[in-house]
Each structure stands twice: as C-alpha cells, then as structure tokens.
C-alpha cells in the first residue's frame, strides 16, 4: 500500500501522506516552516470552516456553484466543525502573514473530503477543486480576516463575557454581604481613613463593570467581515450581492450579529478591530491584576500579615515549610494578566505593520488574541470558583487594625484644625500612645469630645455607598 500520493499545485507535483486530506500547498508549508510548536488555533480553524460553509451556500444561491458541489463542501465543513478532522490542520502560526497557507489548507481538506463524499478520490483526480470551488468568490486576503473576526467575536461572546459577568456577580454579592464591616483604608501602602469592606469590594465590582462595557463597545467593529473584498478590497471576481449575503449567512449559522464591512479596504489593510478589542482585554487584565493583588495582600499572614480576609486553602504551599498555604489563585491570575499585557504589545505592533492594501501579521495577531481570551476566561472562572466565592472577613483582626490606626485623627480636622490633629498623631506614634491619650495629654479636647468625634463608623459616608 502506498504511503504517499502525488498532489499538484501551480508549482508542480509534490508527495503528500496518503492518509491525509491536505494537498500540495499545505505540504509545502509544512516543509518550509518548521518553526516552533505553535499551531493555528482550533477555534480559528473552525471559523475558517464556517466561512467556507457560508460561502458555498451563497455561491449555490447565486448559481455560481452546483448544488451537488456546494452540498458536499458544506457536509465536509460540518465534519471539520464536529472535530472529525482536527489533525488535518498542522500548520504553524509562523507562516505567510496573510494566512494564505492555512486558507489553502482548509480549501484542500474540504475539496478532498467533498470529492470523497461525491464518490470520487482525493488528489489530482478529485471532483471538487480547492481554488475553483471551495475558494470561489474568495481570496485568502478576505477569508482569513473574516475567520479571525468570527473566531474572536464568538470567543468573546461565548467564553469571556459569561465568566466576567459571573465574577462580577460574585464580588457584588460579597460587597453587599460585607457592607457593615468598617475597616481601615490604605493609600500609598500606608494607613488611611476608614471605609467598609463592602465599599472596598464595590470598587472592584465597578472596575469589572466598566471592563465589560469597554469590551462590548468593541464588538460591533469585530462583527464587520472582510469577505467580499477579495484581493485588495475591490471585490474583484465576486457577485454584487455576495458580500452582504455571505455575512448574513454567517450571522444565521453562528447566531451572532455579523455584517459585511462597509469599507473592505480598511478590513483588509488593518487589524484595527482586534487591536481595539484587545485593548479592552488589556484593560480587563489590569483590573484583574489589581484585584488579585489586593486580595492576596488583604489575606496575607496568617499571623504576621494584614490578615483582614481569609481565602480558601486549596493545596499545600511549600515543600519545606509544613502547614504553609499560599494565595495560588491570585498568583495564577496575575501571571496570566502579565501574558495578556505582553500579547497586547505584539498585537499592537502587528496591527501597526503591514503595508498598503494588506496587513501581513494576521496569524500572530489572532493567535495572541485568542490566547488572551482563553487565559482571561479560564483565569476568571478559576479565580471565582476557587477563591472569590470563599472570601470571608476576619472581623477581630479588622477591628484590631482599625482601632490601632493613627489616621482616625482625621475626624478631628474640622473640630480642632489640621495642625493640632497632626500633632496628636505624631505624639501618639512617637510615644506609643493611643490617639485618645495623646489628645488628652496635649489638652486639645476632652475625653467626651474625643469619643463623640472619633467614631470610625461615622467616617465612611453612607454604609451602602458603592453597592
């Protein structure tokens, strides 16, 4: 039995593994780009299959492709979407910057599989042609950016946004539950005036709510599809109705609000939609990193740290120190946030590059974009499940630190003035006195006045503020 078969493209014949559906151009890419281990993301491959499926349907409707071929292409695409042919897409991210080789990988696989479905064979005698049939009315220059947007929008809608909403809801519930717990505030890593634990967490909630708005604001641009622009945006070799119809078909089969891009030149020449959307993801990463850092600082200890909250103890934390437990969910979240920030730099560089009518950094851009979405979605799910839901206040420790804080003296500003209040705080700190003892020693107010004016629960504004 032959282990290879001969496939042919415009450069001539080349041997391809007999058991594989891919063809000549995929094989050339495999041989010419043996770079690292990063492969084209499966979600991008499936987005390419969705794009080819929609194109086959529209080409049939416009009488550009026979019903027999269109049906076979759609069936082959459905098999790809079902994961039956995942190992037929072996190409590296590091290939042509337009994604042409991955587009042809899909064209070849669908053409060979569709030919088999029609009773034919794979290879040069196939019944369905990768360029003339599967790629009809298309160019890699509009197919690949379309697949990028399809994969990105679906990932944001199905993976990231639900997890962001879940974490926001968890923290919102914690904010309400802890609304009456007065604690010391901290600015510049120094003691500050009081607030409630609920107010502190309400700030985290508001951050995530803003992040959601920023992400949702970016979605309409991501929903614009380049398909129909073909090589340089002019729509050469396409039917006048093709671009609109294929966007409508993709909207139907994905249940997502895809539309044809109003300007195909922008859609081909830039990655602006993904640059802007990833900027929102970077903002989310910054917020999550701040939240995770706050959580692990507030939970530091257990005896020699701040220790105002407790978080779940999920696993042993040290191979040498018995009983040690670490804030591992916070650490995982902060690490992946750093990766997302790094991805943003690469995406910005890629988006700013490319020349004239085509951006040629697309595989790198979509690889990093989809990685960021997955990291953030998985990270939020893990942090929520294994940390956030288990946050509990340590009321005794909170009260201890609150009562030891010199910054409660701020309540005296409006009664005795800033300078005298500062003198009280400095004397208390220097001599190891309580604020009350220092105030009475200086003779600036009576004990009754101090007890009436320095009341932490009255220094937090509305106890319900924020949430």
Swiss-Prot record:
<feature type="active site" description="Proton donor/acceptor">
    <location>
        <position position="188"/>
    </location>
</feature>
<dbReference type="InterPro" id="IPR008948">
    <property type="entry name" value="L-Aspartase-like"/>
</dbReference>
<feature type="binding site">
    <location>
        <position position="126"/>
    </location>
    <ligand>
        <name>substrate</name>
    </ligand>
</feature>
<feature type="site" description="Important for catalytic activity">
    <location>
        <position position="331"/>
    </location>
</feature>
<feature type="binding site">
    <location>
        <begin position="324"/>
        <end position="326"/>
    </location>
    <ligand>
        <name>substrate</name>
    </ligand>
</feature>
<dbReference type="GO" id="GO:0005737">
    <property type="term" value="C:cytoplasm"/>
</dbReference>
<dbReference type="Pfam" id="PF00206">
    <property type="entry name" value="Lyase_1"/>
</dbReference>
<keyword id="KW-0963">Cytoplasm</keyword>
<feature type="binding site">
    <location>
        <begin position="139"/>
        <end position="141"/>
    </location>
    <ligand>
        <name>substrate</name>
    </ligand>
</feature>
<dbReference type="GO" id="GO:0004333">
    <property type="term" value="F:fumarate hydratase activity"/>
</dbReference>
<comment type="similarity">
    <text>Belongs to the class-II fumarase/aspartase family. Fumarase subfamily.</text>
</comment>
<keyword id="KW-0456">Lyase</keyword>
<dbReference type="InterPro" id="IPR022761">
    <property type="entry name" value="Fumarate_lyase_N"/>
</dbReference>
<feature type="binding site">
    <location>
        <begin position="98"/>
        <end position="100"/>
    </location>
    <ligand>
        <name>substrate</name>
    </ligand>
</feature>
<dbReference type="GO" id="GO:0006099">
    <property type="term" value="P:tricarboxylic acid cycle"/>
</dbReference>
<keyword id="KW-0816">Tricarboxylic acid cycle</keyword>
<dbReference type="GO" id="GO:0006108">
    <property type="term" value="P:malate metabolic process"/>
</dbReference>
<protein>
    <recommendedName>
        <fullName>Fumarate hydratase class II</fullName>
        <ecNumber>4.2.1.2</ecNumber>
    </recommendedName>
</protein>
<dbReference type="InterPro" id="IPR024083">
    <property type="entry name" value="Fumarase/histidase_N"/>
</dbReference>
<feature type="binding site" description="in site B">
    <location>
        <begin position="129"/>
        <end position="132"/>
    </location>
    <ligand>
        <name>substrate</name>
    </ligand>
</feature>
<dbReference type="InterPro" id="IPR000362">
    <property type="entry name" value="Fumarate_lyase_fam"/>
</dbReference>
<dbReference type="GO" id="GO:0006106">
    <property type="term" value="P:fumarate metabolic process"/>
</dbReference>
<feature type="active site">
    <location>
        <position position="318"/>
    </location>
</feature>
<dbReference type="Pfam" id="PF10415">
    <property type="entry name" value="FumaraseC_C"/>
</dbReference>
<feature type="binding site">
    <location>
        <position position="187"/>
    </location>
    <ligand>
        <name>substrate</name>
    </ligand>
</feature>
<dbReference type="InterPro" id="IPR005677">
    <property type="entry name" value="Fum_hydII"/>
</dbReference>
<comment type="subunit">
    <text>Homotetramer.</text>
</comment>
<dbReference type="InterPro" id="IPR020557">
    <property type="entry name" value="Fumarate_lyase_CS"/>
</dbReference>
<comment type="function">
    <text>Involved in the TCA cycle. Catalyzes the stereospecific interconversion of fumarate to L-malate.</text>
</comment>
<comment type="pathway">
    <text>Carbohydrate metabolism; tricarboxylic acid cycle; (S)-malate from fumarate: step 1/1.</text>
</comment>
<feature type="binding site">
    <location>
        <position position="319"/>
    </location>
    <ligand>
        <name>substrate</name>
    </ligand>
</feature>
<dbReference type="InterPro" id="IPR018951">
    <property type="entry name" value="Fumarase_C_C"/>
</dbReference>
């Amino acid at each position: 039995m032959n282990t290879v078969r001969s496939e042919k493209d415009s450069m001539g014949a080349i041997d391809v593994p007999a058991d594989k559906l891919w063809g000549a151009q995929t094989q050339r890419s495999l041989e010419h780009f043996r770079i690292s281990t990063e492969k084209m993301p499966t979600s991008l491959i499936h987005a390419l299959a969705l794009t080819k499926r929609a194109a086959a349907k529209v080409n049939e409707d416009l009488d550009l492709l026979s019903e027999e071929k269109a049906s076979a292409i759609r069936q082959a695409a459905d098999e790809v979407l079902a994961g039956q042919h995942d190992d037929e897409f072996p190409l590296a991210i590091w290939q042509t910057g337009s994604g042409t080789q991955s587009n042809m990988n899909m064209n070849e696989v669908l053409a060979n599989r569709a030919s088999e479905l029609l009773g034919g064979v794979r290879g040069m005698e196939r019944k369905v042609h990768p360029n003339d049939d599967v790629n009809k009315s298309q160019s890699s220059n509009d197919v690949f950016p379309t697949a990028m947007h399809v994969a990105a929008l679906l990932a944001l809608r199905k993976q990231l946004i639900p997890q962001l909403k879940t974490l926001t809801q968890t923290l919102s519930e914690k904010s309400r539950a802890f609304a009456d717990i007065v604690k010391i505030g901290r600015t510049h890593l120094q003691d500050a005036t009081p607030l409630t634990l609920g107010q502190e967490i309400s700030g985290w909630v508001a951050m995530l709510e803003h992040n959601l708005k920023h992400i949702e604001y970016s979605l309409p641009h991501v929903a614009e599809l380049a398909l129909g622009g073909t090589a340089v945006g002019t729509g050469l070799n396409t039917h006048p109705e093709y671009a609109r119809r294929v966007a409508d078909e993709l909207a139907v089969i994905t249940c997502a609000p895809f539309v044809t891009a109003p300007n195909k030149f922008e859609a081909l020449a830039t990655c602006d939609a993904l640059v802007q959307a990833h900027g929102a993801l970077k903002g989310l990463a910054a917020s999550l990193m701040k939240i995770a850092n706050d959580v692990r600082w507030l939970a530091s200890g257990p005896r020699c740290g701040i220790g105002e909250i407790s978080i779940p103890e999920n696993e042993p934390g040290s191979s040498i120190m018995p009983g040690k437990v670490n804030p591992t969910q916070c650490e995982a979240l902060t690490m992946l946030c750093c990766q997302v920030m790094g991805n943003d730099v690469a995406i910005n560089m890629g988006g700013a590059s490319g020349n004239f009518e085509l951006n040629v950094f697309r595989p790198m851009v979509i690889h990093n974009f989809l990685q960021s979405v997955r990291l953030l979605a998985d990270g939020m799910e893990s942090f929520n499940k294994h940390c956030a839901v288990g946050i509990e206040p340590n009321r005794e420790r909170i009260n201890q630190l609150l009562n030891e804080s010199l910054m409660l003296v701020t309540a005296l500003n409006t009664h005795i003035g800033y300078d005298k209040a500062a003198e009280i705080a400095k004397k208390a700190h220097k001599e190891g006195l309580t604020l009350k003892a220092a105030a009475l020693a200086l003779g600036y107010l009576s004990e009754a006045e101090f007890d009436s004016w320095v009341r932490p629960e009255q220094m937090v504004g509305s106890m319900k503020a924020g949430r």
